[in-house]
C-alpha cells in the first residue's frame, strides 16, 4: 500500500491516502472571522485540502458552506487547530463530521480538554456555550504536513494557551497563529486558564526570528511585509516585557476586557493597517 504515489508518510499522522489533483499552485484562503469567531484558513495543494482552525460552534453550518464554496465537490482531509480556545476550536467537530469525520489535530496538551468538552479551559463558558466533546489526534511540535507543492509545519507557540501552535508555510514565509496574536492592535491575554506571560514573550521572540512575510492573526486580514511584521511583533513584545517588569500586570489604566475577549485593548489605540473589507 505504501508504494502508492499518493501516500505521504508523516510522524504521528501516519500514511495518508490522497487522490491526485491537477497541478495547481498551493493556495491559502482566509475565511474571515465572523463575530466572536477566529479566522479559519483553508490551505489547498496538489495532495488535498487542510483547514486550520474552525471558529466557534455558532456559525459552524455556515462555515461548512463557505468551505464547500471554495473546494466544490472535494473534501477537506483534516483540521489543524492552533489551540483549544472556543473561538478557533468550537466548530471543529461539526465541520469534521460534515466532511466524513476527517481527523482533528491539536497539540497533546489540548487533547484532554477537547475530548471531555471542557467548557472552562476552552473558554466556551464565557460564551454561554457548551464545548462539543471532540475526538482529536496529536500533532507534534515541528511536525510537517505535506501538500505536494508545499507543506505546513507545526511550530510550538505557547503562552495564551499551553497547547498553542502556529502553522508555518515555509515557501510562502507565512504563519497562521490563532489566539497568540489576536490582531495587530490587540495584545493577547495571559490570564486565561493555562496562560503564561513568560511563554508569550518566548513565542514572540520565536516569531521575530522567523523573518516572516505574512502572519494570519486570530481576526482580520493577514499582516504582510517583513518590516511591518517586525514592527508589529516588536510593539507586542515590548508591551509584554513591560508587563513582566510590572509583576505580570497590564497597565492599570487599561479597561478590563470583556469576558469573551481573548485580548487586551490599549487605552491609546495601537496602529492598525489591516482593515477587513465588506
Task: Explain the meaning of each model-derived region.
Residues 56-58, 151-158, 162-244:
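Metallo-beta-lactamase
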Residues 58-61, 68-145, 235-243:
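Active-site HxH/HxHxD metal-binding segment of metal-dependent hydrolases
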Residues 50-53, 75-81, 154-156:
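Short catalytic-loop micro-motif centered on adjacent basic/acidic residues
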Residues 18-71, 166-180:
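Conserved beta-strand hairpin/beta-sheet module of binuclear metal-dependent hydrolase folds
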Residues 6-16, 201-214, 218-278:
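Accessory terminal helices/loops
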Residues 29, 80, 105, 137-139, ...:
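Hydrophobic/aromatic beta-strand patches that form the interior of the parallel beta-sheet core
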Residues 1-24, 45:
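N-terminal amphipathic/basic-hydrophobic helices that include classical n-h-c signal peptides
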